[in-house]
A protein has these predicted regions:
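Charge-rich, low-complexity N-terminal segments
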Residues: 1-140
């Protein structure tokens, strides 16, 4: 059974090297576990959608909760799915500082990434729009 999980967290280290390390690790490990998804980052906040088998997604989320590179990890949305929305990416990436602010303002009060202040469904809609507007990089 496929599931989709959406969570937010705050980055402990916001350097480009730290973010690249997370992406590189994900792109190596995720194919082995049948995991796909995207990671958005901006303003020290991560918003990530992960898709795959129920056990694989649950195990990965448990690992993320214990990962010292993340703090304030919050589950935003979880659902069983019939097909993947982010199946083309072992871990796509979106640097929110490079996104047109009008996209962010469509889903939030301020032009910044803050999944803590909106519903999980709104955050998922933002990710879907970023995918539709080809804002996701790192297809692997």
């Amino acid at each position: 059974m496929l599931v989709r999980l959406l969570y937010a967290s705050r980055a402990v280290d916001t350097s480009s090297e730290a973010i690249e390390a997370i992406l590189s690790q994900s792109r190596l490990a995720n194919p082995v576990g049948g995991i796909t998804g995207i990671l958005c980052y901006g303003g020290g906040i991560f918003l990530q959608a992960i898709e795959g088998g129920r056990m694989a997604v649950s195990e990965l989320y448990g690992h993320i909760q214990k990962d010292l590179r993340h703090k304030d990890v919050v589950l935003l949305h979880y659902e069983e799915i019939s097909e993947r929305r982010f199946g083309g990416w072992t871990m796509g990436q979106v640097n929110m500082s490079r996104i047109n602010v009008s996209i962010l303002l469509k889903y939030a009060e301020r032009p910044e990434l803050d999944p803590y202040s909106v519903s999980g469904k709104v955050s998922l809609a933002l990710l879907e729009e970023l995918m539709a507007t080809a804002s996701i990089m790192g297809r692997a």
